[in-house]
Every structure is written in C-alpha cells, then in structure tokens.
C-alpha cells in the first residue's frame, strides 16, 4: 500500500507579464515534488500579451483560469484558491509570478506546516538582484511609526536558522492549509482589491488562532518592488483623487484606515497609527521628509 500523496495547489494571479510568468513556471518545473501531488492554477486576468497561449504551449498541465481584467491581485488569488479547494488540495501555495524558487522550497514549507499544527508558513523572500538580502519579511507593528514596518537590514545569514514566528506574511509566497481556508475564507477582494489584501488576510488568520511562521530554508527570489510617484510629487488634483476618491489605490485614506483597523493589535492602536500616518503624509506634502 502506497502512502497518500499530499495535494498542493499552487495559485498564481498574472497579468501581461509573459516573460516573467514563464520564468517562474520554468523554475517551478524543477522543484522537488517527492510525496506531493502538485497542480498549478494560473489566473490570467485578461492578459493581451499572449501569456495564456505561451503557458498552454510549454506547460500544458497548468490549469488556466481566465479573468476579464477586473480581478486584480485579491480576486485573482481568490479564484485560484477556490479552484484548488474544488480540487481538494491539502495546502494552497499562493504566490506571485515574479519568483524564482529553490528546488526544496515547497518541501520545506510542507515540512514546517506539518511540524507546527495550525500554522501558515511563508518562504524566506530574497531579492533576485541581491540574492542574500531579505525582502519584505518580518513585518512588525509600530503604532508610533504609523502601523506596519518592514525591517530593512535582514539577510539570509542573519535570520534565525529554524522557522520563526512573525506578525504578518506578505503574499509573495505563502503556504496556507485548506483547513484555514475553510475556517477563515479567502482574501477580502472588495475592500482590498490590489494592495494590503494579503496583510489583512494574515491578520484575520492570526486572530483566528493560526500561527504565522517563516521557514528560513525555503528560499524564493523575487523581483524588487517598483513604486508609483510619491504623493508630494503629484498635482493637488491627483493627490485628492488618490486620497479620497480612488478606493482601489493602496494609498486611499479609507483603505489605509480599514487596513489598520482590521490588522492592528487593538482598535486604539489602529486609530493612533492612522493619525500618525496622516501626520507623516501631511509633512511630506508640505515638503518635509
């Protein structure tokens, strides 16, 4: 009698990044899947650059879920998670397409999840142009700094050697138990369509009693972030539109408040951090740094 394979659904939302998406899938094709039944679900949100055709041509086993261009990050991820749950996955590995993977990254995530019941496990994210430098790992809540803050000086050589607990995990590469999805649902795609949805989801899981861990031997190299122009460099009209009208913009004040309200250690800390954030924003707009 053979042991039952652990079913892992890999979920990746994509949009018009064919070259990067294909690079990520090529890297995934080389990982160790011993003892695992792995299926990849790509949610293509209406790409016009031939992404889906390229995937079908080179990776025919990948399941492609089409979108119409309105899904964005959260809804795209959700459609993939829902497909993985219908497939009856034991775990969902939600990730971005701009990733290159160590061949043991998934085995190490699974091993840590099995050793730590009721855990959500993130990979050690590293920059692909500075392969030793940690990227967006270990966020901590600091009320007097305006909310979540990411340590900037961590490297692959300075992080703990064993899995370590964190307050938040970004969605670049995170292993989520199917049990957690059944218990807590999926990302809040209505309020956080394209920014902060992963942070709010992790806060919800944590409040439900799931421990957030990072497995430091699960290496994933990511593309460095690109940022929009800072608010103080924009015209007054554009600033007002972003802050008060464009509720899909991550800098929208309503979204910023809701994020803190739902992910802070307490409601008082949420309000205080939001006020600090607004003060910092005002000072930057006035030319102070």
PLM region descriptions:
Residues 8-24, 31, 43:
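A conserved hydrophobic helix/loop-capping motif in glycosyltransferases and polysaccharide synthases
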Residues 27, 44-53:
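A conserved acidic beta->alpha catalytic loop
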Residues 27-37:
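Short, acidic, metal-binding catalytic loop of nucleotide-sugar glycosyltransferases
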Residues 67-87:
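Glycine-rich, basic loop-to-helix element that forms the pyrophosphate-binding segment
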Residues 89-100:
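Short beta-strand-to-loop acidic/aromatic patch adjacent to the donor-nucleotide binding site
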Residues 103-142:
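Conserved donor NDP-sugar-binding/catalytic core segment of glycosyltransferases
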Residues 168-169, 173-176, 180-185, 191-218:
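A short, conserved alpha-helix in the catalytic core of glycosyltransferases
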Residues 228, 232-289:
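Non-catalytic, C-terminal membrane-associated alpha-helical segments of glycosyltransferases
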């Amino acid at each position: 009698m053979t042991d039952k394979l652990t079913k892992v659904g890999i979920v990746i939302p994509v949009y018009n990044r064919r070259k990067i998406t294909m690079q990520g899938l090529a890297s995934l094709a080389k990982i160790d899947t011993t003892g695992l039944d792995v299926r990849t679900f790509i949610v293509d949100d209406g790409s016009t650059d031939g992404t889906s055709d390229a995937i079908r041509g080179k990776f025919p086993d990948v399941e492609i879920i089409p979108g119409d261009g309105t899904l964005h990050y959260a809804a795209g991820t959700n459609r993939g998670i829902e497909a993985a749950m219908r497939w009856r996955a034991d775990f969902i590995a939600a990730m971005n397409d701009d990733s290159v993977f160590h061949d043991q990254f998934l085995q190490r995530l699974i091993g840590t999840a099995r050793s730590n019941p009721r855990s959500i496990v993130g990979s050690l994210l590293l920059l692909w142009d500075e392969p030793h430098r940690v990227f967006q790992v270990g966020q901590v809540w600091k009320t007097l700094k305006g909310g979540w803050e990411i340590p900037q000086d961590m490297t692959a050589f300075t992080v703990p050697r064993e899995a370590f607990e964190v307050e938040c995990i970004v969605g670049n590469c995170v292993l989520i138990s199917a049990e957690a999805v059944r218990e807590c649902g999926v990302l809040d795609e209505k309020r956080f369509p394209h920014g902060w949805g992963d942070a709010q989801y992790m806060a919800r899981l944590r409040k439900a009693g799931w421990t957030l861990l990072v497995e430091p031997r699960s290496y994933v190299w990511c593309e460095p972030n690109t940022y929009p122009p800072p608010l103080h460099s924009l015209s007054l009209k554009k600033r007002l539109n972003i802050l008060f009208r464009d509720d899909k913009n991550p800098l929208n004040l309503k979204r910023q408040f809701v994020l803190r309200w739902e992910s802070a250690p307490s409601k008082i800390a949420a309000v205080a951090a939001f006020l600090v954030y607004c003060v910092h924003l005002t000072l930057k707009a006035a030319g102070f740094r």
